[in-house]
Amino acid sequence: MQAFTQLNGLVAPLDRANVDTDAIIPKQFLKSIKRAGFGPNAFDEWRYLDQGEPGKDNSKRPLNPDFPLNFPRYQGASILLTRENFGCGSSREHAPWALLDYGFRAIIAPSFADIFFNNCFKNGILPIVLDAEIVDSLFKEVEANEGYHLLVDLQSQIVQTPGGRHYAFEIDPFRKHCLLNGLDDIGLTLQHVDEIKAFEARHKAAQPWLFNES
């Protein structure tokens, strides 16, 4: 997993509340368990004018000109600004996979669905909770200023605007450690590989009949 320390990123606004995981990545794309390749189908039903299907050439599909993420000014955005209860619905981990593959490393909202919130950390995305009033002001600034960037500093737990305002956010210390060091569940396990091997050796010596290799 790629470490997250500091991000100076273009912000894209998605001014919708209660965006569920089926909107983030529709159910027909859930057959694959590979983490990569979902980006072109993120927000598929809002992003395109036709019905998306696995294996379809997205480069030839008609784009929805009214969907903000299709606006030229937001191409290359790495920070998503959205409304409350983002990521509600089913617990599919494909949702953060799709957002990460699209290019988002941070999501700012007044609140998130719990399972989606946890899945973001496991996949290298930083979900940031800010007060609704702050999110309102950020929406106004993003829409009024083309090329609007925010600086996200995880170590300091600060979001900084181009005008120099700072907004502090909370994060669990363990999750912060994992993001700063690029540790997913596998990475965390590998940190203890010596202890695991030692335990297995002791276990085999104490109960050899469980390890009959004949």
Swiss-Prot record:
Uppermost EC category: lyase
> What is a single cellular component term in the Gene Ontology annotation?
3-isopropylmalate dehydratase complex
Chain segments annotated as transmembrane: none
Q: Name one GO biological process term.
A: L-leucine biosynthetic process
Q: Which InterPro entries does the record associate with it?
A: 3-IsopropMal_deHydase_ssu, Aconitase/3IPM_dehydase_swvl, AconitaseA/IPMdHydase_ssu_swvl, IPMI_Swivel, LeuD
Kindly give the Pfam families that the UniProt entry links to this protein: Aconitase_C
For the keyword Lyase, the answer is: yes
Please name the GO terms that the record assigns under molecular function: 3-isopropylmalate dehydratase activity
Tell me the keywords, alphabetical order. Answer: Amino-acid biosynthesis, Branched-chain amino acid biosynthesis, Leucine biosynthesis, Lyase
Name the chemical reaction catalysed here.
(2R,3S)-3-isopropylmalate = (2S)-2-isopropylmalate
Pathway(s) where this gene product acts:
Amino-acid biosynthesis; L-leucine biosynthesis; L-leucine from 3-methyl-2-oxobutanoate: step 2/4
Q: What is its EC number?
A: 4.2.1.33
Protein family (similarity comment): Belongs to the LeuD family. LeuD type 1 subfamily.
Role description: Catalyzes the isomerization between 2-isopropylmalate and 3-isopropylmalate, via the formation of 2-isopropylmaleate.
Protein name (database record): 3-isopropylmalate dehydratase small subunit
Q: Which organism is it from?
A: Methylobacillus flagellatus (strain ATCC 51484 / DSM 6875 / VKM B-1610 / KT)
Q: What is the lineage of its organism?
A: Bacteria, Pseudomonadati, Pseudomonadota, Betaproteobacteria, Nitrosomonadales
Q: Which gene encodes it?
A: leuD
